[in-house]
Regions:
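Residue-level recognition of alpha-helical structural elements
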Residues: 14, 37-41, 97, 101, ...
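Periodic glycine anchor positions in long extracellular repeat architectures
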Residues: 21-24, 79-82, 134-137, 187-190
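Solenoidal tandem-repeat scaffolds enriched in leucines and small polar residues
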Residues: 1-43
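Terminal, non-catalytic domain-edge segments
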Residues: 31, 86-102, 110, 114, ...
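Glycine- and aromatic-rich loop/turn segments at beta-sheet edges
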Residues: 1-16, 53-74, 112-133, 164-181
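Short acidic alpha-helical/loop segments enriched in Asp/Glu that coordinate divalent cations
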Residues: 40-44, 61-64, 93-107, 129-132
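Acidic, glycine-rich loop-and-beta core segments that form the ion-binding/anion-interacting portion
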Residues: 25-76, 80-86
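An internal, amphipathic alpha-helical element
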Residues: 76-78, 84, 124-148
Length: 212
């Protein structure tokens, strides 16, 4: 902890994301802070939270600064889906009760509900069905939200996406590596996992580290 340097972190990944960026760092430290109270955790959490917010341009859009032009996306790995799944985990564990971020539990739930509605309105659909980059990650969010809050997901939206996925051949287009590889995050293993999770209440979310 004494050697932690935020400038080095900024140079390495100046973007908000659960898998690779500030959101993942914040979530890890919130877990650590719950187990071992340490002011140094709180300091880094607050700094990372500020930096994540500085990348937010509008509702559910965080700029990815790895490229000069900067862009936002809705992927799990480095976009809004992963960020909001992490926040769903925060809500479940009531992490905001442990630290003052200027963000209340009520505001968090409102954002989580609004993101659910954004997904179900089809505003952030893609032509990809992988867990890392596609629509099935969005469905994973809806499943987790329903199981945590009891607020039902829109089955018409789910049916629409599943029907479209079948027509599109469960395409993992534009994912790194081969289209429709057998991999979990960008391939057919992950697609089958999501279908199984939708049909079985006892399967937890891989995308939320099996915490939802």
């Amino acid at each position: 902890m004494e050697n932690f340097n935020m400038k080095i972190m900024d140079a390495s990944f100046a973007f908000a994301s659960f898998a690779h960026g500030y959101t993942g760092l914040i979530t890890s430290l919130l877990c650590m802070n719950r187990v071992v109270k340490d002011d140094r955790f709180s300091i880094i959490i607050k700094k990372a939270w500020e930096k994540e917010n500085n990348l937010k341009t509008s509702d559910f859009n965080w700029i990815d600064k790895r490229s000069e032009e900067g862009r936002s996306c809705h992927y799990w790995c480095h976009g809004s889906c992963g960020i909001m799944l992490a926040r769903l985990f925060w809500y479940k564990e009531e992490f905001l009760m442990d630290i003052e971020l200027g963000y209340t539990e009520e505001e968090l739930l409102s954002d989580l509900r609004e993101y659910k509605e954004t997904i179900e309105a089809g505003k952030i659909d893609t032509n990809n069905y992988s867990l890392s980059h596609g629509n099935f990650a969005l469905i994973d969010y809806l499943i987790s939200f329903e199981r945590l809050t009891g607020e039902r997901m829109n089955k018409k939206y789910i049916d629409k996406i599943f029907d479209k996925a079948r027509v599109d051949g469960y395409s993992c287009y534009d994912s790194p590596g081969a289209i429709n590889s057998i991999g979990h995050m960008v391939g057919e293993t992950g697609i089958k996992y999501l279908i199984n999770r939708y049909e079985n209440n006892n399967i937890k979310s891989i995308l939320a580290c099996e915490n939802l």
